[in-house]
Amino acid sequence: MIVKPIGERVLLKHQKKEEVTKGGIYIPESARQEKKEGIVVAVGTFEDGKELPLKKDDHVIYGGYQADEIEIDDEKYIFVDFKDILATVVEE
């Protein structure tokens, strides 16, 4: 199935918070803070039809309170507004 966001929206695969620290300590779900990072799966366009400045597989940090979750083939994805994308993460 191919999902293409409409308008200034971005489809992300949510990056989950680690369940175990690097030192091997388990972190219960109640103590984990939600990590607002994701990998871009698909992007919409600006109202004038121009491409959003993101591409598939970009690692992004997002903010805001509005995100719609969907499930495709047992994988969870979220739609966020482009205005809520705060930064891209570049590995050095």
From Swiss-Prot:
It comes from the Archaea. Together with the chaperonin GroEL, plays an essential role in assisting protein folding. The GroEL-GroES system forms a nano-cage that allows encapsulation of the non-native substrate proteins and provides a physical environment optimized to promote and accelerate protein folding. GroES binds to the apical surface of the GroEL ring, thereby capping the opening of the GroEL channel. It comes from Methanosarcina mazei (strain ATCC BAA-159 / DSM 3647 / Goe1 / Go1 / JCM 11833 / OCM 88). Keywords: Chaperone, Cytoplasm. GO terms for cellular component: cytoplasm. Pfam families: Cpn10. GO terms for biological process: chaperone cofactor-dependent protein refolding. Its main location: cytoplasm. This is Co-chaperonin GroES. Heptamer of 7 subunits arranged in a ring. Interacts with the chaperonin GroEL. CDD domains: cpn10. Coiled coil: none annotated. GO terms for molecular function: ATP binding; metal ion binding; protein folding chaperone; protein-folding chaperone binding; unfolded protein binding. PANTHER family: 10 KDA HEAT SHOCK PROTEIN (PTHR10772), 20 KDA CHAPERONIN, CHLOROPLASTIC (PTHR10772:SF63). Belongs to the GroES chaperonin family. It is found in: Cytoplasm. InterPro entries: Chaperonin_GroES (IPR020818), Chaperonin_GroES_sf (IPR037124), Chaprnonin_Cpn10_CS (IPR018369), GroES-like_sf (IPR011032).
